[in-house]
Amino acid sequence: MDFKKLANQYRDELLDNVLPFWLEHSQDLEFGGYFSCLDREGKVFDTDKFIWLQGREVWMFSMLYNKVEKRQEWLDCAVQGGEFLKKYGHDGNYNWYFSLDRSGRPLVEPYNIFSYTFATMAFGQLSLATGNQEYADIAKKTFEIILSKVSNPKGKWNKLHPGTRNLKNFALPMILCNLALEIEHLLDPGYLEQTMETCIHEVMDVFYRPELGGIIVENVDMDGNLVDCFEGRQVTPGH
């Protein structure tokens, strides 16, 4: 197998096909932000804007600008998405909504902590691309809010009855590990090391289960034990 040939194939497909598709079809040049619901021809079939996906696209084009090539079109795309998120994506106190309508009006309340994580990633990379301190401050403030929510990520929107089956979920330590590295330039080195050690412990010593053949389960009880229920048996291959 020719790995160099494969690497070139993937790079060419990304730079010559995938990215031009999203640059051309996903940007909402009237209201700002991005369309995420596109068919194979680039036609928009739904105009709602989800904070997860808005943040991911800001991050993607910022990261490409930072690490692949200083293309102005990539930076412009990232900045316009970042400005839309900054203006409409949160409640004024960096509690990030789950979704907005096309013009930026909130549709779903900020119940989902992963809206916060993708916003942090977005503004962390955008601050590197632009040198804009405001973007860095948004990333740091949102990260602080995430940490304050770790013990109860959904807060007042938690629909579970307290005390009956308390579980902790794999997704949060997984993404916190990734997130801390994404905003490494904004964190104290000692704090970064502590966060990484905690997350690695959670992933490798709590959710990784050698007795099940080395799989990672999505949920355990608060003491790290397996739970024989739907949630306890859940495995997410993408994680």
Model segments located where?
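Glycan-recognition and catalytic cores of secretory/periplasmic carbohydrate-active enzymes
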Residues: 1-239
